[in-house]
């Protein structure tokens, strides 16, 4: 018995869509800790960094998790831990580049939607820079990366200022010939 195809049987060669969902959250370090706050590859001054072995970039981590749900390749908790332990690499941009490399040659990123929850830092002044950095790493157009932000209105620990949480939805097109 042959293994079932991961592609739908279509009358002509077609693209199918795969959707990955990612989430990550980290608590802030005490304000006297010198570790910088990094979100979407951008440093936010006057905000403490995150409790994490890496730089704690919850945006890049959520995107990595979304890639994992599309490619079935575990980036965080496996590859990232190996890079950190073996080479001392704590830059989440490196982990995200590995996630991008996990795509098959037949797969192409179509769109990335990100929502970030936290009372601080104020994201609006740096959302454009975050979008540019993400688009650069993912090698997609700027209009394919969208970021929204919410304070959480104090309803969650993130909205109360204890940390930052990020959710994202990654849409990947895959060419599946008949």
Curated annotation (Swiss-Prot):
GO molecular function annotations of the record: 2-C-methyl-D-erythritol 2,4-cyclodiphosphate synthase activity; metal ion binding
Cofactor(s) essential for the protein: a divalent metal cation
InterPro entries membership: MECDP_synthase, MECDP_synthase_CS, MECDP_synthase_sf
GO biological process: isopentenyl diphosphate biosynthetic process, methylerythritol 4-phosphate pathway; terpenoid biosynthetic process
Top enzyme category: lyase
PROSITE patterns given in the database record: ISPF
Enzyme Commission identifier(s): 4.6.1.12
Binding site for 4-CDP-2-C-methyl-D-erythritol 2-phosphate: 24-26, 150-153
PANTHER family reported in the protein's UniProt record: 2-C-METHYL-D-ERYTHRITOL 2,4-CYCLODIPHOSPHATE SYNTHASE, CHLOROPLASTIC
Official protein name in the record: 2-C-methyl-D-erythritol 2,4-cyclodiphosphate synthase
Lineage: Bacteria, Pseudomonadati, Chlamydiota, Chlamydiia, Chlamydiales
